[in-house]
Swiss-Prot record:
<dbReference type="GO" id="GO:0005615">
    <property type="term" value="C:extracellular space"/>
</dbReference>
<keyword id="KW-0732">Signal</keyword>
<keyword id="KW-0027">Amidation</keyword>
<feature type="modified residue" description="Phenylalanine amide">
    <location>
        <position position="96"/>
    </location>
</feature>
<dbReference type="GO" id="GO:0045986">
    <property type="term" value="P:negative regulation of smooth muscle contraction"/>
</dbReference>
<protein>
    <recommendedName>
        <fullName>Dromyosuppressin</fullName>
    </recommendedName>
</protein>
<dbReference type="GO" id="GO:0060457">
    <property type="term" value="P:negative regulation of digestive system process"/>
</dbReference>
<dbReference type="GO" id="GO:0007218">
    <property type="term" value="P:neuropeptide signaling pathway"/>
</dbReference>
<keyword id="KW-0964">Secreted</keyword>
<keyword id="KW-0165">Cleavage on pair of basic residues</keyword>
<feature type="signal peptide">
    <location>
        <begin position="1"/>
        <end position="24"/>
    </location>
</feature>
<feature type="propeptide">
    <location>
        <begin position="25"/>
        <end position="84"/>
    </location>
</feature>
<dbReference type="GO" id="GO:0071855">
    <property type="term" value="F:neuropeptide receptor binding"/>
</dbReference>
<dbReference type="GO" id="GO:0045822">
    <property type="term" value="P:negative regulation of heart contraction"/>
</dbReference>
<dbReference type="GO" id="GO:0005184">
    <property type="term" value="F:neuropeptide hormone activity"/>
</dbReference>
<comment type="function">
    <text>Myoinhibiting neuropeptide.</text>
</comment>
<dbReference type="GO" id="GO:0010459">
    <property type="term" value="P:negative regulation of heart rate"/>
</dbReference>
């Protein structure tokens, strides 16, 4: 087997592994499907509920971050007009020491 054949075989194996892992991740855990959860013990139901809540939290955080990013992009024109200099006065610089 030449190096080129070995390289192609390795690349093909990596692609197949990536595709199979992606499909498994998209399907989600089989134990937390709605028809099966009712038959599970209470502690498993709590775990499934926690997983569902974490998914909801993740989607809420993603939407919040996207909204904040879009607000920053919308305000970027104002920042560019002022050349990134601050216009509000919320601090004062005091200098102590000898006069020159």
């Amino acid at each position: 087997m030449s190096f080129a054949q070995f390289f192609v075989a390795c690349c093909l194996a990596i692609v197949l592994l990536a595709v199979s892992n992606t499909r498994a991740a998209v399907q989600g855990p089989p134990l937390c499907q709605s028809g099966i959860v009712e038959e599970m013990p209470p502690h498993i139901r709590k775990v499934c509920q926690a997983l569902e809540n974490s998914d909801q939290l993740t989607s809420a955080l993603k939407s919040y971050i996207n909204n904040e990013a879009s607000a920053l992009v919308a305000n970027s024109d104002d920042l560019l007009k002022n050349y990134n200099k601050r216009t509000d006065v919320d601090h004062v610089f005091l200098r102590f020491g000898k006069r020159r």
